[in-house]
Each structure stands twice: as structure tokens, then as C-alpha cells.
């Protein structure tokens, strides 16, 4: 999911405005550090999650000078981690550094940095290196951050750790060395499981699935997915990624119904800002729906920001809808590079059978009787013996129930039966039932996504039990008093 996370920017020309912008960035970073510090002491993970979101908003504005000033403020100058992180930052000119030093010198630095702040510094520098396209330095920085994470076992670090895991994998993917870290990711997933770090398990499971699918290792990905522990999702983004990878695995395994549900749910749960991810989900969902014999609505291809990316799939859908094998072949050749880069080439090869079935269904509806020679011509079969192939295709379609017809082998005809009233069958009921089930599932997911006060039901129960206990104590005291009166 590189499209929706990686942020590209143009290199800003050097100017004298750095002296006015750097202090503001440094000021924001200080506020974020204070938020992380408060969350660490209070053990409130939501504060640290908010700090990460604020950091993503500042991502485009990060400069080497402001990062250097922040490292001097948070870390002890001359310490091992300070020296290591400072070595990754490029040296700015003296004027910029003087401004940052003057700005940071007015603030009292943190004497004993928390592990959360140290990990946050790793995250900041790593994001900066990736945005500057310094991937080799980013790989070294990410490896150092992962080594530091192994020595920290605090639940307040989990949010920062999950981000570091993602960028750690992204660095190696951008350099084409994704296979090198598969063993390390498995080890990290094992550590996260032992530490009951559920957010880390979610993130690492998705990274491992992405790693396997990148090299088309679908069987290994399914074995890992089926054996990995599952629990309630902590991150909506990670759950969307998981559903997308699950949909891809199900598609390759020919489980198209489950794949369609997973892919559509992933596209629906994805953030609106993640346009690239939603485009990928829609591409796979369109192919899966075509393989199921469905024709996606035109509105699917007209979604805002997706028209250009989904154009090849729109033309492909049109060829499948018409049942024109020659048009389908031309579209597949025209956009072969696009389908190859999307990883859907093998699925489009499977669609050829659906195109033939659709064309045959149209012929069956249009003609009450037609010769197999004409069937072969209309389907545009390019085999050495098209009539024999047409006879075989018609026979299989009749056997599978795709068309309601009979085959006259003696005369070489396909005789279609009269089409019945579809409203007298169970198909409308099945269609309505599927739509109602979809709405009910969406309602249940919305209810489960609501946030409730922690332990609210337990507090209510404890209050009721307390009243019962007090009532029982009063009755017991009254009973004892009556017994004492009887003794007298």
C-alpha cells in the first residue's frame, strides 16, 4: 500500500524564509514531545496516537535544521542515540544552524528522555529520510530503531512501534530487498505476540502478508494468515489492509464470493485520503465481480479521482458485457502493461471463459435456433476447428445451466428454449435478501465501531451488587437483633 501512504513532494528552492518557519516547526515538535511525555506518564495510549497524527500533519514541513534542534532538545547531546540520529541528517549552512541553535537554546532540554521520546526521534528521522529519498540511510536508521525497540517492553510504545515496523518494511521494499527482512518480521511478530502487543501483531501480520504476496507466495500467506491469532481490530487502517490482502488471497484460491466481500469492505473502510489504496481495492473488486458473472455499475468507474486509473477496467468490463472475444483480446493487449503492474494479468486470462459464456448467452436469447457454424463466427473463435470448439462450449454451458437450450448434433444446431418470467423464480427474492443482509452487516459494523465508556457496565453491576449487599447486611443485622431479643 505504497500509493496511499508515501507522500511525494517537490524539492523546495533555498530561501531566507527558513529562519521564520523553523522555529514554528520546532515549537510544534516540542508540543508533540510534551504530549508524548504526558501520555507515557499517565499510560494513555490515545495521547501518543494523537501525537503521531499531529506528526503526519507536519511531515511536509520537516527540515533538517528543525530536526537537529529537536534532537538537541529531547536527547542528551553527545549520547549514543543522539550521535547516531544526527549522523543521518544533512548539514545545513551556518546561518540556518545559528537560528535553530538560538531557538533551541532558549528552552530547557529534557535531561532524562523517556523511551517513548527516543523511539519518536527515530520515527521522525526515518520519515524525513524516506521523504528525501535517501533510502540507504533510511534502511540503516530503521534497522537501528528496530534493534532499540526489542529492548523496550512498554504498551505506551506500541503505537510508535507499529509505525516504525511499517516504515522499516517500506525502506526495504523501495530498494527491492523486501525478501531480506522476512525472517526479521516473523521474529518481531513472535515478540509482539509474547508481549501481547495487539497493534504490533496487526501491523506485522499485514507486513508479512504483503511480503509474501509481493513474491506471489499465496500458499504461504494463507498458511500464516490462518495460523496467526485474530482479535478485535485496533486500527481501522490496518484492518482495511488485512481485508485487502485477504481478498487477494481468496481471489487466487477461486473463492470469488468471499473475495468480493473482503475487497468491497476494505474499500469502504479505507480513509478518504487513501486514494491509491481505494483504487487498488476497486480494481481487484471489479475483476472479481466480472469473474462472478456480475457487471459493475457505471458509477463504480466514475468515482472522484479514480476515472483515469479505472479506465482500462472500464473498457475491459464493456468487452465482457458485450461478450465480444475480439474486443476483449484487443483491450487485454492494449493495457497489458497496466494489468501487469497491477498484478491482475492472470485473472484477466481467466475472464476469457466468462466473455465466451456472455456472448453465448446473448446468442441464446436472440435466436431460437442457430447453427454451430454461426455460433463460432459470432463468438469469433480463432481455433483450428472452431465448429468443434463451439459444440464443446455450448455443451458445457448447457450442463452448467448458463443457457437453457438443447444441442442437435445431427443437424449441428443449438435450439434455445423460450425464456421464462424471471419474476416467477426465486432470483428476485435472493437479490433482495443479499441487499438486506448487506445493510444489516453494515449496521452491525457501525455499532461495533462505536466507543463506549470503559467498564461502564461493570460499574453499574458493582453498584447494584453493593446495594444488594447493604440490604442483606441490614436484614442480617435485624435478624440478629431479633434473636438477641428472644434470648432475653
UniProtKB/Swiss-Prot annotation:
Its main location: nucleus. Residues 240-421 form the PCI domain. Residues 456-481 have a biased composition (Basic and acidic residues). GO terms for biological process: regulation of protein catabolic process; ubiquitin-dependent protein catabolic process. Residues 1-20, 452-488 are annotated as: Disordered. Coiled coil: none annotated. InterPro entries: 26S_Psome_reg_C (IPR013586), CSN3 (IPR050756), PCI_dom (IPR000717), WH_DNA-bd_sf (IPR036390). One of its GO terms (molecular function) is enzyme regulator activity. The keyword Transport does not apply. Keywords: Nucleus, Proteasome. It holds the Pfam family Rpn3_C. GO terms for cellular component: nucleus; proteasome regulatory particle, lid subcomplex. It is found in: Nucleus. Belongs to the proteasome subunit S3 family. Acts as a regulatory subunit of the 26 proteasome which is involved in the ATP-dependent degradation of ubiquitinated proteins. The 26S proteasome is composed of a core protease, known as the 20S proteasome, capped at one or both ends by the 19S regulatory complex (RC). The RC is composed of at least 18 different subunits in two subcomplexes, the base and the lid, which form the portions proximal and distal to the 20S proteolytic core, respectively. This is Probable 26S proteasome non-ATPase regulatory subunit 3. It comes from Nicotiana tabacum. The lineage of its organism: Eukaryota, Viridiplantae, Streptophyta, Embryophyta, Tracheophyta.
